[in-house]
Amino acid sequence: MVWEVKSNQMPDAVQKLLLVMDKRAPGVSDSLQLLQCKETLPSSPGYNSCDEHMELDDLPELQAVQSDPTPSAIYQLSSDVSHQEYPRPSWNQNTSEISENTYRENEVDWLTELANIATSPQSPLMQCSFYNRSSPVHIIATSKSLHSYARPPPVASSKGEPAFPHHWKEQTPVRHERANSESESGIFCMSSLSDDDDLGWCNSWPSTAWHCFLKGTRLCFHKGSNKEWQNVEDFARTEGCDNEEDLQMGTHKDYGSDGLKLLSHEESVSFGESVLKLTFDPGTVEDGLLTVECKLDHPFYVKNKGWSSFYPSLTVVQHGIPCCEIHIGDVCLPPGHPDAINFDDSGVFDTFKSYDFTPMDSSAVYVLSSMARQRRASLSCGGPGGQDFERSGFSKNCGSPGSSQLSSSSLYAKAVKTHSSGTVSATSPNKCKRPMNAFMLFAKKYRVEYTQMYPGKDNRAISVILGDRWKKMKNEERRMYTLEAKALAEEQKRLNPDCWKRKRTNSGSQQH
């Protein structure tokens, strides 16, 4: 039995529903007789009744609903992940003759694509509880304004003092408040910041508490009245006071105003967590040196280099900032410094365009970058938008074998050199070593320490001890090694896709 819904034109132009019941088709079992309705209901006055038609007068009158002719933005997540960047007619013989200038006017760059994906309903950023704010989000980005950190300095005051120390003082309360709600979330989220609207890029990045140091960093000055370890938040709060007593005691308002030069670095354990112990030189003898303890993924903006870190793979996962490797002698700049400007599409931006991510981690940068990468891959392979892809700016970003390829290759080469273990063996181009997993990275880091703790034990016994220590570690402690192993594995898999395939050398497989 088939039920249909038909509309019947009434004299008063009111549509009503008519339920039409078809007769039972031949061959249908008699057990379906109960489904047939043989009762004839009285129809409305003035209309003829029929055995096959039933008019239901108690149904509400139907009213035509005017649909909005303008299509809404639809974000579909499929094998060819895409989003609606701007209205564009589908390709046919008529639209193929449209000039390229029409499309170039609506071109969007790599950052805008990520921004559009980030604001889609499927984006994990839209599901953040702290994202729902009253003020709108303004996203107008270019490679020249990659981060709000690398901004031109504000207008200098009339007193002739440097502009950037004054800038820290004014922005410290706002940035500190933002760090509590966003940096602790563990993902790369976007926010609506009224004080950054004029920058053209309102992407919140991990906020500095003082100078170039993030929340959670510990400071120890080698000179001055206070040589004890102190949290950077407490120090910044003290520096924000304008008491005359503090000024007479000698504060550090202009400390390292031209940047901090890295003198030494080492890894240590503080409060049960692996940290970096760094020593900086402010450039003036009277100020003295500074030693800090920060997290392994702490990013620094280095003069003439851009964003840098000791563990770039961890930094890009935790903060969403692709970095170069930092070295001894690099000068770390504070926010607002005249040299802290993203200069001419630096290697950091090229690394960001060439870095390969997977949505294996809950971090939003993995998800968004993977969505954009899948879309670019589908378009470059001759998809429905292949011709539009060639017109856009992504073709030159992804197809140029220039600095983006070199930057990622150099980072990978350094990572392999740093994390390689065992005897060095000559590897041919056709044979590559598999990257180390999380436990191997952990064992490499602490093998020397455990060997000194247990003298007389061979390498196998030390491995057993390390394995027991690994099993007792918490998931939070393992996460650092897991993320680093993922980043190294994905980068090596991208550069050497065949290294994951075990080739058979027997005669049976060679006959295929």
Curated annotation (Swiss-Prot):
Residues 167-180 have a biased composition (Basic and acidic residues). One of its GO terms (molecular function) is RNA polymerase II cis-regulatory region sequence-specific DNA binding. GO terms for cellular component: nucleus. Its main location: nucleus. Residues 432-500 bind DNA. Ubiquitinated by the CTLH E3 ubiquitin-protein ligase complex, leading to subsequent proteasomal degradation. GO terms for biological process: regulation of transcription by RNA polymerase II; Wnt signaling pathway. Residues 201-343 form the AXH domain. Residues 151-180 are annotated as: Disordered. It is found in: Nucleus. Binds TCF4. Binds RB1. Binds the second PAH repeat of SIN3A. PANTHER family: HMG BOX-CONTAINING PROTEIN 1. Transcriptional repressor that binds to the promoter region of target genes. Plays a role in the regulation of the cell cycle and of the Wnt pathway. Binds preferentially to the sequence 5'-TTCATTCATTCA-3'. Binding to the histone H1.0 promoter is enhanced by interaction with RB1. Disrupts the interaction between DNA and TCF4. This is HMG box-containing protein 1. It comes from Bos taurus (Bovine).
